[in-house]
Amino acid sequence: VGSEMCIRDRYIIKKNKYCLILALFILSFYLGRGVCALAKNTGKNTNSTVIVIDPGHGGSDPGKISTSGVMEKDVNLSIAMALKQLFENRGFTVVMTRTTDCDLAPDNSKHPKTDDLTKRTALMSKSNVAVSISIHQNSFEDSSSCGPQVFYYEASDAGKELASSVLGALNTSLCVANPRSIKPNKEYFILKKSTSPTVIVECGFLSNPAETLLLTDKNYQDDLAHAIYIGVTDYLAQSPSGHLQ
């Protein structure tokens, strides 16, 4: 909504105990002022649209771990569950690759990582799936790195369009001062193997202590989920395949 304050501005107001550190963080890396325009709801019937949401990692695979011990798998699941609720409230059919702290590999698997990813991509590749969204968190040796980033399979035009829509919504709603570009990739297993338009959404950097505070806050997780939801529904509304009917 055009009259709404930037999500990060609202977050600071709500989270007084983190006010100083977050204010410094935002002044360094984000606009921290102005109005953010969010995309409008399509208002269309979405009952026949299937969305796969994939909270990355899980079980014995924690993913990235912050210096304070925050595990990526837990943040991924929290954001993914918030995103699930948004889609279901709007009438979408949601398929989750996991809803608990687990992986998808069999207990006796000799190649647990490959088996886990294979099962995830099998869910993403069913014929009725409109899009697949894999939720992750980033990490980098430079602890000042921050902000969202979205990856897509380099040979997928639909994946590129989806990535652009999702990252655009994130950058707009988070008022990112120095937005990253969408990133083509030809190596990531789920991007390469999934037959539905698929993106990996890196919501932020667990290597950045200030951003870790944001990523572990429930209100901010809800805001991230809402931005991703807007990006996906905008993509579906404009998709020539007509998934949003």
Give each language-model segment a name.
Residues G159-P184:
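Active-site-adjacent substrate-binding region
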Residues F92-T99, S134-H136, V176-K183, S239-Q245:
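Surface-exposed patches in mature extracellular/periplasmic domains of secreted proteins
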Residues C19-R33:
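Hydrophobic membrane-insertion alpha-helices, especially the h-region
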